[in-house]
A protein has these predicted regions:
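Glycine-rich, acidic/polar active-site loops that bind/position phosphate-bearing ligands
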Residues: 120-306, 315-318, 325-562
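Short linear, low-complexity motifs centered on an aromatic residue
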Residues: 73-89, 108, 207, 214-216, ...
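Active-site core of metal-dependent hydrolases
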Residues: 7-120
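Hydrophobic/aromatic-rich, well-ordered segments within soluble, folded domains that form packed cores
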Residues: 61, 65-69, 285-299, 325, ...
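C-terminal amphipathic alpha-helical interaction region
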Residues: 493, 498-698
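Flexible inter-domain linker/hinge segments
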Residues: 1, 5-16, 165, 169, ...
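Active-site-proximal loop/turn and secondary-structure-junction residues that shape catalytic pockets
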Residues: 44-48, 68-70, 98-99, 146, ...
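Short, intrinsically disordered, low-complexity segments enriched in Ser/Thr and Pro
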Residues: 84-118, 229, 352-353, 476-484, ...
């Protein structure tokens, strides 16, 4: 029987495989490209391509694809076979360095936000050698970036790699000031915890809303939900456990470090957490994880729902983005050190994050903005839409002492002067796990909790990396010219604490009084919906910062703003149209059918005994008749409102109309339809109920 260590990464062209299949010179050259970004020689590319092809064919692969992440939010691939014609009429298996490095898929059907004209169909994919190639089915998948004919990024990987390089550049400047001469690079690492729901496939296929939108648009509350807290960390049901076992095996074969699995708070909700890895690799792995979750679930007669809010009345699903910075020598820059200098270095990087989050709250908020995630944020199950940082009382006490040049209770020293007095060592576990905080320090990393479950983690990490890079640049510019480094360092950390402590909040983020304090007293941003926050991507300070660090060009920023608003509008319009369709073709006929049966029952009874009151039946018929009138009326109103959207002069105007009008009409239609469900016989109700969906998997 094979063990996990026997087959882990068996479908990945990783470092072990490269060492075994490449010559020493080729391997060393490729490692320099991966580790230092050195240019890849054509002869090396050819050797790597040949070895990659031979390895893939030996594992049953017949095709290869440049696997990329366009602005749709999911992955894309076009499969080409390895075969080339041979002179004797047969075929040979061939794969060149040119085919490895560059591809030319048709870009015309991917979102571009105006970055290319309709007739400019050509796009390019370029190999990302830092993310290992892997085999999926019979296809060798080569992780790539995707750009237009003119060179503009049309994907999520390209700006992510740019943001990682921007942070690396600025962090290296800081580390040199602290005398870290052995460090060659700084990488950001991420471990994204993935939440999801599993429902029975047969039930799923009876619900148009789940099929078309990924969430239920109608559904009365189940008699039981998550009130008993008996699902969280509870015993995993056999079908779910079997699916999880298969999922782990598939992920491990692809070198994905799936570590922890458990039941989440809501019925039918679960979580998978991996071990952290370099950000661009973690992004690739998370995209793969979501894809494989859905495929494996289907094999077990289940459907994996990744929507942020598939069911009203119970928790939705998020994705916690555990983010840290580390040197190539293995030093976590968000871990307190042993010496005064190490502690000062830690505090400087900590303050860089605090400053970044405060200065660019809007970018962090819009980086997680989608129609689905708008249902979660601020709903007493997820962090609020207001961005704040949780540090814990002990770390906050240290920062207060530094700001005020005051004694800190955790040390015998009289003042907290950096570089002179040793800051107290505090274990990682002294920071509580504040689940209500959007951005929490958890000992040696920050946990960004606002991401939606179906989101790519790329955008959130792009904005976070870029914002921190900007803070570090400001610090490096000041410190590099300082006459007295220690004094300048102390003063700068002190100033950061004073200027940006408004973003720090250690209390209950669900409390309504916090939102009032945050916005009215502290002046923090509160953008409840995607249309509220997305236009701020174009604010001058944001455009200036993102272009200065070469994360995006101005045109790329404008394109992404338009695309995100378009995606929002399209998602909600599909939901609205689905509601109209379900109301007219399923709900109204079902309620009318039940009312007709009741009316027939009354007529039959009165034919036998004319003096019978039949109060129950007549009362219910009257109520159902009133509800059907309301459902029909509100369905017509919703349909008309959707048609009115065509008059919007811009995607921004359309998104505002959806926020202000469409969502309210959808909620009004749902309210009366859900009321009708509670009054209609289950024999007549046309699709599975919440109780059946949430508790139907055994």
């Amino acid at each position: 029987m094979s063990t996990v260590s026997d087959y882990f990464g068996c479908l990945v062209f990783d470092d072990r495989v490269m060492k075994a299949n490449l010559s020493a010179d080729v391997y060393a050259s490729l490692r320099r490209t991966i580790d230092e970004g050195a240019k890849l020689d054509a002869s090396v590319a050819n050797a790597v391509a040949a070895a990659m092809k031979d390895w893939a064919v030996a594992h049953g692969a017949t095709h290869y694809t440049h696997w990329f992440q366009p602005l749709t939010g999911i992955t894309a691939e076009k499969h080409d076979s390895f075969i080339s014609p041979a002179p004797d009429g047969g075929v040979i298996m061939d794969f060149s360095g040119k085919e490895l490095i560059k591809g030319e898929p048709d870009a015309s059907s991917f979102p571009s936000g105006g970055l290319r004209a309709t007739f400019e169909a050509r796009g390019y994919t370029a190999w990302d050698p830092t993310s290992y190639a892997f085999i999926k089915g019979k296809t060798l998948c080569i992780p790539t970036a995707f750009c237009s004919y003119g060179g503009e990024a049309l994907d999520k990987k390209t700006p992510l790699l740019r943001s990682m390089e921007a942070l690396n550049r600025q962090a290296m400047r800081i580390l040199k000031l602290f005398g870290n001469t052995d460090v060659k690079c700084v990488r950001t690492n991420v471990g994204p915890e993935q939440e999801y729901f599993l429902v029975d496939k047969e039930m799923y296929e009876q619900r148009k809303d789940l099929i078309f939108t990924g969430r239920t648009l109608f559904g009365a509350k189940s008699p039981k939900g998550q009130e008993m807290d008996d699902h969280y960390f509870g015993v995993i049901k056999p079908r779910v456990a079997a699916s999880m076992e298969d999922l782990n095996e598939e992920l491990w074969k692809l070198g994905i470090l799936a570590k922890t699995e458990h039941n989440e708070v809501a019925p039918a909700q679960h979580e998978l957490a991996p071990i952290y890895t370099t950000t661009n690799i973690a992004t690739d792995h998370n995209q793969l994880t979501m894809e494989i979750m859905q495929k494996v679930a289907a094999k077990h007669g289940l459907v994996c729902l990744l929507h942020e809010k598939p069911f009203a009345g119970v928790n939705g699903s998020g994705k916690h983005n555990n983010w840290s910075m580390a040197t190539d020598t293995g030093v976590n820059l968000l871990s307190p050190g042993e010496t005064p200098y190490e502690n000062a270095q830690f505090l400087l990087f900590l303050c860089a994050v605090i400053k970044a989050v405060d200065d660019y709250q809007d970018l962090l908020r819009l980086s997680v903005a989608t129609a689905g995630n708008d249902h979660r944020l601020g709903a007493n199950e997820a962090p609020p839409a207001v961005v704040s940082i949780f540090l814990g009382d002990e770390l906050m006490g240290i920062l207060d002492a530094i700001e005020n040049d005051a004694p800190y209770s955790g040390t015998k020293k009289t003042t907290m002067k950096l570089g002179v007095d040793v800051l107290p060592r505090f274990p990682r576990d002294t920071t509580d796990r504040n689940r209500t905080s959007p951005f929490a320090f958890t000992g040696n990393k920050f946990e960004f909790r606002m991401l939606g479950s179906s989101n790519s983690i790329a955008c959130a990490n792009i904005m976070l990396n870029a914002a921190v890079a900007e803070s570090l640049k400001i610090y490096a510019d000041r410190l590099e010219g300082a006459e007295d480094f220690e004094t300048a360092l102390h003063d700068m950390i002190k100033k950061t604490i004073k200027d940006h402590k408004r973003i720090i909040f250690n209390g209950n983020g669900y409390d309504a009084t916090w939102i009032k304090e945050a916005t009215e007293v502290r002046g923090l941003c509160n953008y409840p919906t995607t249309p509220d926050c997305m236009p701020h991507l174009l604010d001058k300070k944001n455009v200036d910062m993102l272009t200065a660090h070469k994360i995006y060009s101005v045109s790329e920023i404008q394109a992404r703003c338009d695309i995100m608003l378009e995606n929002y509008c399209k998602a909600v319009i599909i939901e609205a149209n689905t509601m109209v369709d379900m109301a007219r073709k399923q709900i109204l006929p079902a309620v009318e059918g039940y009312a007709a049966e009741l009316a027939a029952s009354v007529a039959a009874k009165k034919a036998v005994a004319p003096n019978l009151a039949c109060a129950y039946e007549t009362g219910l018929v009257t109520k159902l008749s009133g509800l059907t009138d309301q459902i029909a009326e509100k369905t017509d109103e919703l349909e008309s409102a959707v048609l009115e959207l065509k008059n919007a002069e811009s995607v921004k105007e359309e998104s505002f109309a959806i926020r202000d009008t469409i969502l309210g009409k959808m909620a009004a239609l749902r309210a009366v339809a859900d009321e009708a469900e509670t009054q209609t016989s289950s024999d007549y109700w046309p699709f599975p109920t919440y109780g059946e969906l949430l508790f139907g998997v055994k």
